[in-house]
UniProtKB/Swiss-Prot annotation, chains A, B, C:
Gene of this entry: uxaC
Record keyword Ribonucleoprotein present: no
Pfam families: UxaC
Superkingdom of origin: Bacteria
Name of the protein in its database record: Uronate isomerase
Species annotation: Phenylobacterium zucineum (strain HLK1)
Molecular function GO labels: glucuronate isomerase activity
Keywords of this entry: Isomerase
HAMAP family from the UniProt entry: UxaC (MF_00675)
Similarity comment: Belongs to the metallo-dependent hydrolases superfamily. Uronate isomerase family.
Length: 480, 480, 480
């Protein structure tokens, strides 16, 4: 059965007619604002090389763990979905993999994935019928053709999407060659990097030792000495800032921070290098490094992002065969009040530091995060993240944080995605949900419509620019 | 004051007129579907013997901890409510107990109990005025009379309620005589059992040793040896399957699982039998047994249900005098991410195993359970349970699980009740709430109405049949 | 830009027209009921001395941590906001501080603070334009003038606000002189005290030793002996009851209770006095004292309130400079099920005891608190507290507790404030939110409108009077 694909202009607005009218007006003032994407995981090589994307499966399905984890949960093997394993590329025929997705679209009913996909199918590729078993081949063929045309190259899409700024995320061991190539090419698209040092901080990461060696090579520092190790961080941060970075990012299992003496920090570092360390040692080192990163941020001005609370690689069998980031990362209960205290005791009242905190544990929104951000000058709240980057998730974020932290201790939207084509769809969802939330406040006479308009624009555009220091004169020439 | 009793046809639908219209249409397509009740606690003797229920108090009040715990919380002694104690039957006159309920109906405003009761009073008994102090006797008399008529016998009600299948829950030490008698009687009602081995697994259960003896007698196994004990489980599972069982059920204090070596499991079992064991030993044994049950399910195909997180018998004084299941079980914070890992590491990627997980800790819906069920092939989410089997509770379940797990990693509704007459009321509430939730998605243009119709039918009928393997050809002849 | 200030008559009601009509009717029956304020932190000296309040900054901003913490979170130093430090009064000019607030009102969009302020500005001071940078001086001047007039003295406002009863909160070491003076003055306003013994119970409180000495002086007891210490509590409780107290209040870091033997309690007390104690000792002592307080309540009839779960003075630097209660108290995850068990095992089934429990951890509403209060005769649920005393917070409280605990295990509203002028605003918000919640139940046909009217009046007026024993014949002459 073939069904029409329609992106209703009122989608995601509250159903009540009066509230919807207000939402429509608020959304009208933000829908065409440029996209600021200050945190995400697109591949800089796309913009450096500007090569065409290969086909629908390799564009949409194989890299998107939101999609293939859902199919996997219903018993479809990853090998049939185009997902590469440690042994090499997937044995699946891309067209067959695409058909598998197409015939299981009912699994995504009520999920953000279906909204994002339909947005892309309708807005970017112009489809007017839904993806289904019947239309799988039509989709696969038309998408394949389109991708060969110049209008669907990464840079062309970047411009078409009205992206004012896009940040990627790299490891300190990345030589930033794609960012350099982009700049050398003279292309005007503003793509910057962000400093994510987890591989050289997390001693439990499978690549820790190899990353550390590479870290030493790139910086010429003795990274087996504590002072050399810290100096290497300073150098790579500076190098990242030359490629436009205004932020760092830290994806630790918990939000723990520590504030050890120099001697204790040094001894701990030596212990980690000896490889004779416990999980508690590794945790304490990650905790200490957040405080070290904060100290460096006070010097160089980089905004810190903390993304804690994911139990990575939960599925042992899958990890052994397919490696990381395969949809098997599961959120855990996360404490902030005790975890952040050492860092806050040291730097919480600094006005020159900015730390953006995220959570996968919504129970902390009203209980911990809004009260912390509503008090400490250094703290801001990142938007609803990952599993919660969804209509209901975003609504809960606003409902549970606004009354204590207000809107102005939040930082606007992050798409946080490597699904490049979904970026406009994701920002559009955020703008619609914020418009709907503000519209409810207006309809309940808790906020004037004038104030709501101003706030809507701030959430969509001004707050991310300010929070990520994107409108400040850059400290390094290259960031302009 | 006497007030009319009205069951409004639009009850529980969202108030917004447009959304309500959609909900009405969706509900229309499911309201008359047969009831599938794959998990509950009705007494098989009712259907085996088909004896009349005694009176209103003994039918509604004395066995329903939802009702008497609320009266108890306001200072009414259980002895006045018909609730039996360990010393014997209640000293209360049933009519007096009924009057006590009737004159306190305001306590139930806004609770599901009042909706369930009113549904039964109106739909099953035809009352058109509300229960109150003034109408207490009228109710007591009319219900008493009705219960003597053939139309109110258990089997007649079963048929009138349009129940396609009803599962009861029995201990391994139950000889299943009522199920056997039912089958022998030639009655066509499909009532099956389910295997709930807690009394022979939980060494802290007050009947553990006695249950174990009985377990040995029934199976002829040496249940004091580890292999004999496991073999006894296999034999009782097979016997339960002969009485139609398609599932097991496990009501542990936590969701902990373990995967011990054979030697360690055996040693632990011996320790428990020595009675010289710690609470941690008992917990580890329950954890190990979940993994053992999963292993057996891979062989015999029974679906596992895990109902963790209730702190049983919290009120020490009440437990001493009245025993278990007296409304004093309190939910606790429950971890799933670490707890389930040992079992999932062993069997999480099996396609021949199905584990349905429940929770009393709603904070785990979006954080842990939806991400786990949205990834692992073996996991499905049971519906909102116990305290959360209520309009707001069900809404939160859908709002917090759908965006990550979708609808198709859930299993439809369980009434989980021993209040037989409330079964249609409870399924009706679930169908109305799901219709309302789907209607909101349609009204917000997040789902087409066609897809919503299909999903509504799946939630009400197809998913429970599939999840509990009720439409599969049975592996044992008796289950047909 | 100057904008009109309007308090819309329908504010906070649900947007749906039909539901709003019902809410309007329900609110109509409660809006003019007298205010019962059984728990709060106003200063009894205001009513004893009836001196005029000084100016807008000292009335609104400097004492209100909701306001200045938000400004502080955005980088405004407390010294610029009129907040006194340990070193003495604030160096800020009150008018300058007021301008700082006025020009940052956008920070409060969507927060209850903005609703409360606007209510006071509009209803109490008659402003018809919003506070902003442009109107800061106008506001400061007009408020300053008004405060000098007799109509704005504390007692006149008390009467204008239609307050039937107001409870303040004092330490056992307070000599209650202001309460005595009030009574001696012949003023008819009913202002009573409440017994908050934290400073003589919490050995980690910075004033513990000094408070203990004062406690001994006031009572003439040897408070370094366990029996003398307990006797001193009994005496101060009696003295508080003479000043109208009907309740005690306990603000511990957790909800832990204990039930030690006499010998163990005595030994623990000696250890605390030796000053050679661990945090765990201090915690155990607080836990034991809750049980001791319950035992005394059984004798003297005082209602217990437990307000647990705040991590006090989280910001070490701020605490060192400005002291306690400066907006740096952060909620923590709070367990009730295990924490309350020792007290409940001892006294949970008493009908002569009443314990009102509060939480800052909303995840405990549906999981722990509603099930506990829906079972134990001694337990009632306090209203949404502190960070959750807000429109969304109150809604969540009702949505998450009503289905299990009903309305009648809750105790109506507490304003819990030291912002005297905001008391009518806060009660008005609570009445509107409850009207809106009840209206939704009526609109969804879950409650009749007659029952909703009765319930609305109970929540606004009857339940607080009953729960705090304000309509019982007093046991002491002074309480009448």
């Amino acid at each position: 059965m073939t069904r029409p694909l329609r992106l209703h202009p009122d989608r995601l607005f509250p159903a009540d007619a009066g509230t919807r009218d207000i939402a429509r007006r608020l959304y009208g003032s933000v829908k065409d604002l440029p996209i600021i994407s200050p945190h995400g995981h697109t591949d800089p090589e796309w913009f450096a090389g500007d090569a065409p994307f290969p086909d629908a499966t390799n564009l949409f399905l194989a890299p998107d763990h939101y999609l293939y984890r859902m199919l996997y949960s219903q018993g479809v093997p990853l090998d049939r979905l185009g997902v590469p394993s440690k042994a090499g590329p997937s044995p699946a025929d891309p067209r067959e993999a695409w058909r598998m997705l197409a015939s299981n679209m009912h699994l995504f009913r009520g999920t953000p994935s279906s909204m994002w996909l339909n947005h892309v199918f309708g807005e970017v590729f112009g489809f007017e019928i839904e993806l289904s078993a019947e239309t799988a081949d039509l989709y696969f063929d038309r998408i394949g053709e389109a991708l060969q045309s110049p209008a669907f190259r990464p840079r062309a899409l970047f411009e078409r999407f009205n992206i004012e700024l896009l940040a990627t995320t790299e490891s300190p061991t990345d030589d930033l060659r794609h960012h350099k190539a982009m700049r050398a090419s003279g292309w005007k698209g503003r793509v910057v990097t962000a400093y994510r040092p987890d591989p050289v901080i997390d001693a439990e990461h499978e690549d820790f030792r190899a990353s550390l060696s590479r870290f030493g090579e790139l910086t010429g520092q003795d990274v087996e000495s504590w002072s050399g190790y810290l100096q290497a961080h300073r150098m790579r941060r500076a190098a990242f800032m030359e490629m436009g970075a205004t932020s760092t990012d830290h994806g630790h299992p918990t939000a723990a921070t520590a504030d050890l003496s120099l001697a204790d920090a040094e001894a701990l570092f030596r212990k980690l290098l000896s490889a004779d360390f416990s999980p508690a040692d590794a945790e304490l080192f990650r905790a200490q490094m957040l405080t070290e990163m904060a100290r460096m941020s006070l010097d160089d001005g980089l905004v810190m992002q903390i993304h804690p609370g994911s139990f990575r690689n939960h599925n042992a069998g899958l990890f052994a065969r397919y490696g990381r980031d395969k949809g098997a990362d599961i959120p855990t209960r996360t404490d902030y009040v005790r975890a952040l205290k050492p860092l806050l005791d040291r730097f919480g009242n600094e006005r020159g530091l900015s730390v953006i905190v995220f959570t996968l544990d919504e129970s902390s929104y009203a209980r911990e995060l809004a009260p912390l951000a509503g008090h400490y000058p250094v703290l801001k709240l990142g938007p609803a993240w990952w599993f919660h980057d969804s209509p209901e998730g975003m609504r809960r974020f606003r409902e549970q944080t606004t009354e204590t932290a207000g809107f102005y201790n939040t930082v606007g939207f992050n798409d946080d995605t490597r699904a490049f084509l979904s970026i406009p769809a994701r920002h559009d969802v955020a703008r619609r949900i914020d418009a709907g939330f503000l519209a409810r406040l207006v309809a309940e006479h808790r906020l004037s419509e004038d104030d709501a308009h101003e706030t809507a624009v701030d959430l969509a555009y001004n707050l991310p620019k300010r929070a990520y220091k994107l409108d400040e004169p850059a400290r390094t020439p290259a960031a302009a």
